[in-house]
Structure formats: C-alpha cells, structure tokens
Amino acid sequence: MNRFADLTAAGVLTAFGSDSPVTDLGPWQAVAAAVHHHQPAQRISPIAAFRAHSVAGWRAVGDHESGVLAPGAPAHYAIWDTAASLNGSAPLPTALRTVVSGATVHDLGVVGAR
C-alpha cells in the first residue's frame, strides 16, 4: 500500500492529501509516514515527501505558477520552524508564518525577531 518510491521512480506526479475524517488531518504526519514507510523500499526523501504535500497539489490541478518563490508568482507560502525533525519521536514542525495571496494570515511573531 502507498508505493511512494515506485510512483516517484516511474515519474508519476504524487500529490498527498488527507482522507479526513477517516484519518487525522496531519500534513506533517503524512510527510513523516512517507519518509519512514513501513516498507523500506517504498520510502522517499523528506524533500520528495514535502513536495508531494505542497507544490504537487498545485501541479495536479494544472497550476504551474503557484508553489514557487519567484518574482511575479502568487505569494502563497509558509515559514516553518527548522529545528523540528521528521524523526518519529521529535516534535513536528511549527508554522511560524503563513502568507496567502501576499497577505499574512498566520504569524507567531518570531520571524525576524531578535
């Protein structure tokens, strides 16, 4: 089940999502599950898993402009706490700031604070 490595190797665009309320809505848990797949041969890198849960969703719906940080691109992005790890016992990453269409919609007030 969830043959992430096989799909990735075959060049299949793999976009993660959630089947909530069947399972908990947890994007980072899904990324961690793909990185630490129960079948070692089906594990994918953290970068591939993160892309599957971010930019791949835009690509799956035919949007080839969103999901990148580039001049003129729509400003949809999040800044994450990089001290977090996808190790099963480590705390999950925390969103420090989220920007949608250029407007800040979430801010913990720690980005750029000294």
Tell where the protein language model's regions lie, with residue ranges.
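His/Asp/Glu-enriched, well-ordered alpha-helical/loop segment
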Residues: 1-82, 98-104
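Conserved protein kinase catalytic core
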Residues: 25, 87, 107
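Short, small/polar residue-rich loop motifs at catalytic or cofactor-binding pockets
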Residues: 62, 91-93
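Short, Lys/Arg- and Gly-enriched loop/turn segments at beta-strand edges
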Residues: 84-90
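Glycine- and charge-enriched low-complexity intrinsically disordered segments
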Residues: 104-114
